[in-house]
């Protein structure tokens, strides 16, 4: 049985996927785990692979969802993407890709999409 926190995380990840699909992106994979971290969603926007981090914060007591993606998390995100691409016999250098953030507030309707968050 998944914990309540994990169930809520899965719900927000699914809502992020639906939102991105409504914007024309195609689903590639979800919850890809590596020793260095996890990729929440991998989507395709035409010829571009999009590695999506999904964050949610009920309130800003410990910072917003956007603020929670610090440099340590960004490094893990890049490393996980690099490992996933290596499994596909590709690399960050030879693949058109970007890193987007979907940040939720308290509800699934409170959504912010930041394209090229790591740009």
UniProtKB/Swiss-Prot annotation:
Organism for this UniProt entry: Pasteurella multocida (strain Pm70)
Drop me one GO molecular function for this one: nucleic acid binding
One Pfam assignment: UPF0102
Sorted alphabetically, which HAMAP family does this protein's record hold?
UPF0102
State the protein's name: UPF0102 protein PM0647
Which InterPro entries would you find in this protein's record?
Answer: Restrct_endonuc-II-like (IPR011335), tRNA_endonuc-like_dom_sf (IPR011856), UPF0102_YraN-like (IPR003509)
Q: Which domain of life is it from?
A: Bacteria
Q: Which family does it belong to?
A: Belongs to the UPF0102 family.
């Amino acid at each position: 049985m998944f914990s309540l926190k994990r169930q809520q995380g899965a719900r927000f990840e699914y809502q992020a996927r639906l939102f991105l699909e409504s914007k024309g992106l195609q689903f590639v994979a979800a919850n890809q785990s590596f020793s260095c971290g996890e990729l929440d969603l991998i989507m395709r926007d035409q010829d571009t692979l999009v590695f999506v981090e999904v964050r949610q914060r009920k309130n800003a007591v410990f910072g917003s969802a956007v603020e929670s993606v610090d440099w340590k998390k960004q490094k893990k995100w890049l490393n996980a993407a690099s490992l996933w691409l290596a499994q596909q016999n590709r690399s960050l250098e030879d693949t058109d890709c970007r890193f987007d953030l979907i940040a939720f507030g308290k509800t699934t309707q409170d959504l912010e999409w930041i394209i090229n968050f790591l740009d």
